[in-house]
Amino acid sequence: MKKLLFTTALLTGAIAFSTFSHAGEIADRVEKTKTLLVGTEGTYAPFTFHDKSGKLTGFDVEVIRKVAEKLGLKVEFKETQWDAMYAGLNAKRFDVIANQTNPSPERLKKYSFTTPYNYSGGVIVTKSSDNSIKSFEDLKGRKSAQSATSNWGKDAKAAGAQILVVDGLAQSLELIKQGRAEATINDKLAVLDYFKQHPNSGLKIAYDRGDKTPTAFAFLQGEDALITKFNQVLEALRQDGTLKQISIEWFGYDITQ
């Protein structure tokens, strides 16, 4: 009964960000300031980017805004290049990363994550005229434009590709257009959004891995109480259809399951 009443409270209104027992340092600061500091790129559409009016928006941005709203917190975004994102978290420049980041085994050794709030997969992008790359194996010895610390970059390196380090997806795709890179591995949803915005890009998805990689919010280890709060709200947003609604607004279908 207590669990039911708590879930109902989550579904119908905001939850007070109450005092935690055994709270971490970040949770203590958030409780005092009532402000959540969020690390995000702001350049990775459709997850985190600026619209035509200059407003920071995107799927990940709107999900964490809704979570913060339910917790009775204000949100302050700290825009950061991807390759500096986890360094920023380590330095406590922000409390959490909201940037389509997945809890890989390597990251789980150093960081803690919420339950997933969406699922996507990896694809290889090449020029439309290039039919020589049809799998990860075909990347061996080829030039692949990747963020140095991303999982996609590690996948490309594992496949034997020559890595051209870039800041993000947009730069990767530009290098392919220019002929300076032959391919890139990235998130399928981000690539499809780019194609939607640039229908004459001259690029294509050369290979779709067909996987469903989970995405979650990343925290420093030791913030279990704060993560528990996040997980409770995410579950409530899943139950009342809010997560699905946000997903449909951005993608036309549900990516949260």
UniProtKB/Swiss-Prot annotation:
It comes from the Bacteria. Keywords: Amino-acid transport, Periplasm, Signal, Transport. Residues 1-23 form the signal peptide. CDD domains: PBP2_Ngo0372_TcyA. Its main location: periplasm. It is found in: Periplasm. GO terms for biological process: amino acid transport. PROSITE patterns: SBP_BACTERIAL_3. One of its GO terms (cellular component) is periplasmic space. Probably part of a binding-protein-dependent transport system for an amino acid. PANTHER family: L-CYSTINE-BINDING PROTEIN TCYJ, MEMBRANE-BOUND LYTIC MUREIN TRANSGLYCOSYLASE F. This is Probable amino-acid ABC transporter-binding protein HI_1080. The lineage of its organism: Bacteria, Pseudomonadati, Pseudomonadota, Gammaproteobacteria, Pasteurellales.
